[in-house]
Every structure is written in C-alpha cells, then in structure tokens.
C-alpha cells in the first residue's frame, strides 16, 4: 500500500503526539488484543497475561519500538522491518491476521488517548500505515 505525502505527514504527526507514551500504548494495545481476540494468546503461552504484567510491558515496548522504527523509515518500511519480518514468518509463524488485530487495537488506543488528533483523514492515514506494516511483516510468508 502506497502512503501519500499527506499520509506520511499525518502518521508522523500522530507519533509525535504519542511521544514518550509509545511503550505504554504498546502494552495497552497487546492487552486489548488479548481481550478482544483471545486466540492471539496462543502465541504467548509462557507470558503472564494479567493487566500490567512485566512480560506484556516488555513485549509492548518491542511492539512500540517496531512501530517507531517504521515511522522513522516511513519511505522504506520493508527495509526497516526486514529482520522482524523474517522472525515472524520463519521462526514464530504468527498467523498474518494477527497483525490486523494488533493494528486495529493500536488505532483504538490512539483514539482513546488522542481523540482530537484522530480526525477521519488521520485515521485513514494511520490505518494505511498499519496495513503497510502488516503487509511488510507478512511478506516473507510462504
């Protein structure tokens, strides 16, 4: 999916508002995903999935870091997330639909914390960006 110049500006604008909360939002996104889509828990059998667990916070930090990396390299998301794509496709074998679930939950978290920033245009841009990230992460699946 091709992001327009306006999309890129909108995505960078949202992430500038997220700022120092990215790790917190990453953990909240995971908690929402595990609640709304309980089948996603199967990839984390060794995790304490209770609210506020250290493992969810740590993985939320990784999710946030990957999204920030994608934003920082918005013109080359595939290059920025290549190793992560390999990991998810070849080692973890995560069902690709889970990236859509994660993206949806991230949109909800952004909407809760920054409702005025999530205009229809920004929402569409952020959704396109998250779809692009999901596409990159599933590109190496066979």
UniProtKB/Swiss-Prot annotation:
A molecular function annotated in GO for this UniProt entry is: oxygen binding
Domain of life from the UniProt record: Eukaryota
* Entries under Pfam families matching the protein: Globin
Q: Which SUPFAM superfamilies does this chain map to?
A: Globin-like
Instruction: Answer whether the UniProt record assigns the keyword Heme to this protein.
Output: yes
Give the UniProt tissue specificity note. Answer: Red blood cells.
List ligand-binding residues for O2.
59
Q: What is this protein called?
A: Hemoglobin subunit alpha-A
To which species is this protein native?
Anser anser anser
């Amino acid at each position: 999916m091709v992001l327009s110049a306006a999309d890129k500006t909108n995505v960078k604008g949202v992430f500038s508002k997220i700022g120092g909360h990215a790790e917190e939002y990453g953990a909240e996104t995971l908690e929402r995903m595990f609640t709304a889509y309980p089948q996603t828990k199967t990839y984390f059998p060794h995790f304490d999935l209770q609210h506020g667990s250290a493992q969810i916070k740590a993985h939320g930090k990784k999710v946030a870091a990957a999204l920030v990396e994608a934003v920082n390299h918005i013109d080359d998301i595939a290059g920025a997330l290549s190793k992560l794509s390999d990991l998810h496709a070849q080692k973890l074998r995560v069902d690709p639909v889970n990236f859509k679930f994660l993206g949806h939950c991230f949109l909800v978290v952004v909407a809760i914390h920054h409702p005025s920033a999530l205009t229809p245009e920004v929402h569409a841009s952020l959704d396109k960006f998250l779809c692009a990230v999901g596409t990159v992460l599933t590109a190496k699946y066979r």
